[in-house]
């Protein structure tokens, strides 16, 4: 079936009142970026719907991209027909023949923005219903919860017919909730946290700590590839690489083993906050889940959060590990996340870290190191890269990956 357009229905935008136009404008920009590889498209955002005219572009490929754009409740591929009922009948029958299996139930549902058209909504429903009953007597008309709905939109320029409704990604358009930094470790949890942040309309930047020679180039490439996995939802994400070797070595030399992880996480948070403030980010997201590891007990979180007043948001905080894994598989980050390249959270990890560290002790041990100097040197070495969904960082690592797996 050659579709003419895709009709997009908004998600939570319907609740946004006076901000509705700003949300629609942001969604229009996000959709335009997501579909930039299809130059013949015409995108027309309206108050209650968005219409994407295909102009010969492949509908399946366009819909696959569209399904990853947050802020969309659902969408329907549609066929434009001249406002001639004989032609509408013919296309409606063709559409039902191609999409409606024998014996299913259906109803006709008409919306009319062109009130000058000869038939009103009820008359249109009856006209098409009678025609289809005559041509497809195997179909059963059912007004409540039918198997299929033939949707009809009567607009000024044409009549649009559709039988498919495809679920969108939901959520809010990315960027409508502001911008934040995400602490990306390379494990399973933080990419899922990033996905949830994007879904709530937050434009995220990835902050990744890199400690050569203790962490490898493969570990860095893995973190970049995880970022690329999330970019289809937003178009591009900035990846901020923070050198952390000197800080880790200094902490290992001067801080008791039980507090290594706590002080290390405090420095990570200090650096993330500094970067966030420089770049206008309003909050910090991470992949912490309460009680999952020693640094994620409530006592540990309190001792670590002590260094910042910036909001710390933990989207997966109350999820079980199996729930996080299921979401990682759904967004296609799980297989990457479990590749066994050490990151800076695992090197120097003590065998028995404090699970209930005291904030005053953490402050005391942190005072033994030159926090300001270490941070200045780390921030001076920060590298920032814009990552897009088409970027590939793991290709050169295939032989290494094959050996590991």
UniProtKB/Swiss-Prot annotation:
Sites binding ATP sit at 183-184, 208-209, 265, 287, 296
| Gene Ontology BP, a term | tRNA 4-thiouridine biosynthesis
What residue ranges carry the coiled-coil annotation? none
Lineage per the UniProt record: Bacteria, Bacillati, Bacillota, Bacilli, Lactobacillales
The annotated pathway is: Cofactor biosynthesis; thiamine diphosphate biosynthesis
Q: Which GO terms describe its cellular component?
A: cytosol
The entry's keywords: ATP-binding, Cytoplasm, Nucleotide-binding, RNA-binding, Thiamine biosynthesis, Transferase, tRNA-binding
Q: Which Gene3D superfamilies match?
A: 3.30.2130.30, HUPs
What enzyme category does the UniProt record give?
transferase
| Matches recorded under PROSITE patterns | THUMP
Question: What Pfam families does the database record attribute to this sequence?
Answer: ThiI (PF02568), ThiI_fer (PF22025), THUMP (PF02926)
Protein name as annotated: Probable tRNA sulfurtransferase
Give the matching InterPro entries.
Answer: Rossmann-like_a/b/a_fold (IPR014729), ThiI_AANH (IPR020536), ThiI_fer (IPR054173), ThiI_N (IPR049961), THUMP_dom (IPR004114), THUMP_ThiI (IPR049962), tRNA_STrfase (IPR003720), tRNA_sulfurtransferase_ThiI (IPR050102)
Q: Which GO terms describe its molecular function?
A: ATP binding; CCA tRNA nucleotidyltransferase activity; tRNA binding; tRNA-uracil-4 sulfurtransferase activity
User: What's its EC?
Assistant: 2.8.1.4
Species for this entry: Lacticaseibacillus casei (strain BL23)
Look up the domain of life of the source. Answer: Bacteria
Q: Which residues form the THUMP domain?
A: 60-165
């Amino acid at each position: 079936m050659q579709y003419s357009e895709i009709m997009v229905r908004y998600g939570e935008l319907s609740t946004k009142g006076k901000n509705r136009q700003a949300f629609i404008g942001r969604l229009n920009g996000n959709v335009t970026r997501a579909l930039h590889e299809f130059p013949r498209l015409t995108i027309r955002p309206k108050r209650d719907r968005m219409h994407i005219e295909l102009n010969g572009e492949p509908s399946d490929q366009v819909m696959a991209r569209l399904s990853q754009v947050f802020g969309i409740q659902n969408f329907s591929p549609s066929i434009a027909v001249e406002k001639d009922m004989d032609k509408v009948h013919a296309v409606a029958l063709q559409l039902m023949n191609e999409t409606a299996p024998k014996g299913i139930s259906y109803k006709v549902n008409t919306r009319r923005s062109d009130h000058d058209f000869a038939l009103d909504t009820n008359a249109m429903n009856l006209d098409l219903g009678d025609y289809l009953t005559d041509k497809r007597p195997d179909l059963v008309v059912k007004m409540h919860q039918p198997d299929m709905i033939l949707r009809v939109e009567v607009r000024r320029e044409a009549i649009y017919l559709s039988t498919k409704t495809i679920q969108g990604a939901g959520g809010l358009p990315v960027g409508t909730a502001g911008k934040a930094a995400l602490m990306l470790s390379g494990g399973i949890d933080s990419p899922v946290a990033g996905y949830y942040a994007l879904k709530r309309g937050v434009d995220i930047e990835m902050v990744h700590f890199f400690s050569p020679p203790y962490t490898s180039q493969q570990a860095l490439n893995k973190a970049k590839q995880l970022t690329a996995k999330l970019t289809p939802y937003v178009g591009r994400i900035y990846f901020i690489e923070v050198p952390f070797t000197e800080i880790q070595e200094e902490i290992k030399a001067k801080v008791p083993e039980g507090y290594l992880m706590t002080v290390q996480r405090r420095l990570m948070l200090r650096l993330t906050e500094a970067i966030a403030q420089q770049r206008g980010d309003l909050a910090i997201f991470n992949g912490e889940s309460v009680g999952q590891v020693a640094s994620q007990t409530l006592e540990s979180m309190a001792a670590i959060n002590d260094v910042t007043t910036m909001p710390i948001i933990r989207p997966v905080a109350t999820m079980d590990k199996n729930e996080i894994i299921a979401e990682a598989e759904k967004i296609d980050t799980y297989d990457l996340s479990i590749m066994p390249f050490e990151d800076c959270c695992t090197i120097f990890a003590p065998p028995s870290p404090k699970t209930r560290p005291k904030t005053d002790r953490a402050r005391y041990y942190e005072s033994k190191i030159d926090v300001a100097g270490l941070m200045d040197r780390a921030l001076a070495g920060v590298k920032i890269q814009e990552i897009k969904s088409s970027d590939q960082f793991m290709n050169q690592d295939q032989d290494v990956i094959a050996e590991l797996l």
